[in-house]
Amino acid sequence: MITSPTTWPSPAKLNLFLYINGRTDNGYHELQTLFQFLDHGDQLTITANDSGHITLTPDIVDLPVEQNLIWKAANALQKKTGCTLGANIHLNKILPMGGGIGGGSSNAATALVALNFLWQLGLSDDELADIGLKLGADVPVFVRGHAAFAEGVGEKLTPAQPEEKWYLVVRPDVHIATVDIFTHPQLTRNTPKRSLETLLDSEYGNDCEKIVRMIHPKVDKQLSWLLQYAPSRLTGTGSCVFAEFNSRSEAESILAQLSDNVSAFVAQGRNISPLKETLADYLSAQNRPI
C-alpha cells in the first residue's frame, strides 16, 4: 500500500461523432461513436489507509455517498479483489453533471485506476474495464486511456488517432437526461454502419443533436452561435456543445466573445488520457513496470 497523498486527473471527453445504427433485442441502442479526451477535468486527491472504509469529500447535495460513482467504483474494487484497505478521496469538481462530457464516468475510472495502483492490486486494464462497465457504459474508455472508436452498445473499443484539435466547449444552462433522448420517438435510429476509415474521412455528426436542439432552445441557441465561427456539434446527449479549431488562440478569441454568464472553457483534444500519463509517472517513480 502506498500511503502518501496522490493527485489524479479525471479528464473530460468529447464524442467527436455519434451515430445510432439500430436497437438490440433487449432494447439497447447500437451505435458508432468516437471518443477523445480533453486536457481539462476534475481532480481526485487520494490517500490510501488500512481502515477498510472509503470516505469521500466534499458532500454532494442530494446525492448519498453510496450513490456516488467514485464510492461505487472503490467498493466494487474491494469486492472484486477482497481488498481490506480503505482510502480518503477528495474530489475537486470542475466538470458539470449531465453535460455529456463524461464527468461521473471519468471520476469512476480515475478511482479504479488510482486505487489499483495505491492498493497495489495488480489488476490489468481489461479487469478494471470489466468492473467499470458495470458502473457505466463510458467507464471502460476512461480506464483504458486511449481515444477510441466505440461500437455495439459502446462495449467494443478500437484505439483511434483523431487529430488533436483545440475545442471551445460551451455548457448551456440545462440538464439533459440521457434516457429522455434515447427514448424520444423522433430519434434517428437507422444510420447505416460505416467503417472507421470511412467515418474519419466524412463530415462528423451526432444523431442526438436534432432532438436535443428541438426540445432544449438554450442548446439550439448556443450551437447556432458557435456554428457562425467553426464546425460545431453536440457531444453525447448534451448539454455541452463544442466548436473545433486548429489553434488555441483561435478558440480563445471566440471564447472572449461569449457573455460572462455563459459557462465555457478551451481545451485540447488528447488521444492519450492525462490519467494514463499520470499513472505512468507514478509507476516510473516507483520503478514499477508501465
Swiss-Prot record:
Domain of life: Bacteria
An annotated Gene Ontology molecular function: ATP binding
Pathway the protein acts in: Isoprenoid biosynthesis; isopentenyl diphosphate biosynthesis via DXP pathway; isopentenyl diphosphate from 1-deoxy-D-xylulose 5-phosphate: step 3/6
Annotated catalysed reactions: 4-CDP-2-C-methyl-D-erythritol + ATP = 4-CDP-2-C-methyl-D-erythritol 2-phosphate + ADP + H(+)
Entry binding sites for ATP: P96, M97, G98, G99, G100, I101, G102, G103, G104, S105, S106
EC number(s) from the headed UniProt entry: 2.7.1.148
Catalytic residues of the enzyme: K13, D138
Enzyme class of the recorded protein, top EC level: transferase
Biological processes per GO annotation: isopentenyl diphosphate biosynthetic process, methylerythritol 4-phosphate pathway; terpenoid biosynthetic process
Alphabetical keyword list: ATP-binding, Isoprene biosynthesis, Kinase, Nucleotide-binding, Transferase
UniProt cross-references to SUPFAM superfamilies, sorted A to Z: GHMP Kinase, C-terminal domain, Ribosomal protein S5 domain 2-like
Sequence similarity: Belongs to the GHMP kinase family. IspE subfamily.
The protein's role, per its UniProt record: Catalyzes the phosphorylation of the position 2 hydroxy group of 4-diphosphocytidyl-2C-methyl-D-erythritol.
Name of the molecule in the record: 4-diphosphocytidyl-2-C-methyl-D-erythritol kinase
